[in-house]
């Protein structure tokens, strides 16, 4: 799905809801499915949209910045957040933990900002479930799943990125 088509869908959703109701837009896909690219295009096209910075225990990739791309945590700090119930969702994928802080998402929604979340498939499912219990999230939620054009293209993307082991491909 191109960012232009997705942007059009989000625009329609924003117009059908209550005036000034912020949206929580979940973009999910398999690893290498284009989540980051689509999110970057959406953020460039919709200046009023902001992304929620998520937490991870994985190593920093080239060009990533603390607090802008992710909050990079050690395993002990991440576990403390899990135990405190601070995450809207969290999961371990290929040995690395990822999580979305409730305060990060709800704070931005309460400021009237549309929030974009780039999450894995597990994370999107968890957020959809939890949103049913939190009216503020349920009202704001728009969930989009991206599929790659083909499995061969997905494998090519993952190989080109060079961050996954051959066993994980």
Predicted regions and their residues:
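Extreme N-terminal, non-catalytic leader segments
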Residues: 1-24
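Residue-level preference for the first positions of well-ordered beta-strands
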Residues: 22-26, 114-116
């Amino acid at each position: 799905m191109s960012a232009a088509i997705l942007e059009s869908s989000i625009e329609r959703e924003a117009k059908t809801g209550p005036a000034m109701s912020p949206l929580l837009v979940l973009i999910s896909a398999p690893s290498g499915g284009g989540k980051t690219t689509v999110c970057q295009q959406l953020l460039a096209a919709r200046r009023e949209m902001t992304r929620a910075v998520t937490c991870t225990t994985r190593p920093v990739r080239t060009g990533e910045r603390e607090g802008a791309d992710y909050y990079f945590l050690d395993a002990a700090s991440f576990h403390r957040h899990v135990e405190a119930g601070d995450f809207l969702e969290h999961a371990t994928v290929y040995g690395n933990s990822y999580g979305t802080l409730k305060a990060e998402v709800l704070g931005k929604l309460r400021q009237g900002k549309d929030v974009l979340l780039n999450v894995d498939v597990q994370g999107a499912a968890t957020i959809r479930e939890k949103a049913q219990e939190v009216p503020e999230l349920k009202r704001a939620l728009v969930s989009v799943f991206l599929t790659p054009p083909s499995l061969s293209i997905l494998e090519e993307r993952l190989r080109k990125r060079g961050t996954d082991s051959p066993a994980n491909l």
